[in-house]
Regions:
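N-terminal secretory signal sequences
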Residues: 22, 27, 52-53, 100-104
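Amphipathic alpha-helical dimerization/coiled-coil segments
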Residues: 78-104
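Short, cationic-aromatic polyanion-contact patches
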Residues: 6-16, 62-86
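N-terminal helix-turn-helix DNA-binding core of bacterial DNA-binding proteins
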Residues: 15-41, 69-73
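A short, conserved structural fragment
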Residues: 54-64
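Short amphipathic alpha-helical interaction segments
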Residues: 41-55
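Residue-level detector of family-conserved "landmark" positions at structurally sensitive sites
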Residues: 33, 46, 63-64
Length: 104
């Protein structure tokens, strides 16, 4: 079943944006490639995207656990900051529009 996402509706539903949304939603944590499969992208696509995102410094390697490398969104990157701000604004707008006004 396909989940609805305000962020993906706004920026486009592509594998790259799905991975970035996944990392933005859990921006305080770091993730393995296997974890990132939860963003609904294939293993092959993920292995193509990660080197490009690292090259652009949108994501960074954080640590290794055994053979697994962990990654997270690079909050110091200008583009990543803008995507995070956009994500947060879209979520807040959506929450504001969902508020039900109750007469006093």
């Amino acid at each position: 079943m396909k989940e609805e996402s305000i962020f993906l509706d706004y920026v486009g539903d592509s594998p790259r944006m799905r991975v970035l949304q996944y990392l933005i939603e859990g921006r305080g944590l770091d993730y393995t490639l296997t974890d990132m499969l939860n963003a609904r992208v294939s293993w092959g696509t993920l292995n193509t995207l990660i080197p490009k995102l690292l090259e652009l410094k949108i994501i960074i390697k954080t640590r290794k656990i055994g053979r697994a490398t962990l990654y997270k969104i690079n909050k110091d990157n200008v583009l990543a900051k803008q995507l995070i701000e956009l994500y947060d604004k879209l979520i807040m707008e959506n929450l504001d529009s969902m508020k039900i006004k109750i007469p006093a």
